[in-house]
C-alpha cells in the first residue's frame, strides 16, 4: 500500500531471525514468502520479527501460514514477534494467534527456544 517493505535476516543466539518492516500486502508478500520459505527449509526454529510491520493483509498472513507449514514439514517451527496492536488484533480476529501466537519481544521468543533446548540464556 505504498510503504516499502524491508526484510533483513540475521542470527541471534543461534536462531535465524527475519526482521520485517513496512507493509506486507499483495505487492510485497511474495518477497517475504520466498525469504521465509528459504529459511524454513533448514528445519530449525525460525523467528519472524514483525514488530516494525504497520500493515499486513491476507497475502501476508498466507505467507506466514505457508512458512509455518514448510518449517513443520522440515522439522522446524515458525515463531512470530509482534507488539503492535493493529497486527496483533488482526492475528486475533483471524484466529492466527492460535496457530502462531505472537510474542511481544524477540527476547521472549529466544528465551523460550533456549529453555526448550536446555541451553543457558
PLM features per residue range, with description:
Residues 1-52, 66-121:
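STAS-like cytosolic regulatory interaction modules
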Amino acid at each position: 500500500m505504498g510503504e516499502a517493505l524491508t526484510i533483513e535476516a540475521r542470527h541471534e543466539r543461534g536462531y535465524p531471525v527475519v526482521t520485517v518492516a513496512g507493509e506486507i500486502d499483495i505487492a510485497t508478500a511474495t518477497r517475504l514468502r520466498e525469504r521465509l520459505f528459504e529459511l524454513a527449509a533448514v528445519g530449525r526454529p525460525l523467528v519472524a520479527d514483525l514488530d516494525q510491520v504497520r500493515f499486513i493483509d491476507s497475502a501476508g498472513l498466507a505467507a506466514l501460514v505457508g512458512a509455518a507449514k514448510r518449517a513443520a514439514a522440515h522439522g522446524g517451527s515458525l515463531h512470530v514477534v509482534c507488539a503492535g496492536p493493529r497486527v496483533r488484533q488482526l492475528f486475533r480476529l483471524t484466529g492466527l494467534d492460535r496457530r502462531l501466537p505472537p510474542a511481544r519481544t524477540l527476547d521472549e521468543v529466544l528465551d523460550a527456544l533456549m529453555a526448550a533446548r536446555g541451553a543457558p540464556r
